[in-house]
Amino acid sequence: MDRLTVDTSELHKPLIKFEFSSLIQFEGEDEETYEPEVEVDLLFKLERVCNGVKECLRSWRYLKEFDVEDPEERDNLELEIEISEPFTVIFCDKNICPGCCEYRMVVEGKDFEGEFEFLRVVKPVLTALIQGYVSCDY
């Protein structure tokens, strides 16, 4: 989705606040059943790569489920859903390796129900605010 490189080699006790924001959009439908369902299940992961070692720092789940049903199980129903909503997460990293590390947000589709006209994550932005102490050698 998005990535950035952070260099903390000149900082003592660095702390990094990450914010990831995006827009999740989908249009799905299910029809000709007495229990139509539309479901989107995504897993967002913040990964850190330092010295070639990849580590998942944190994951967040995005889950939307919509269903209707005919309790008599006689009528075929139709369900159409269109969603466009923000998805934002914040994470603070304080266990930082000295030097340069790459941070990236990735998304993985876990489960889907229904038929989709489209499903996308748009405008992904990963930002970082870094603080720490700088040693003065002069």
Predicted features along the sequence, with ranges:
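Extracellular jelly-roll beta-sandwich "head" domains, especially the C-terminal globular C1q domain
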Residues: M1-Y138
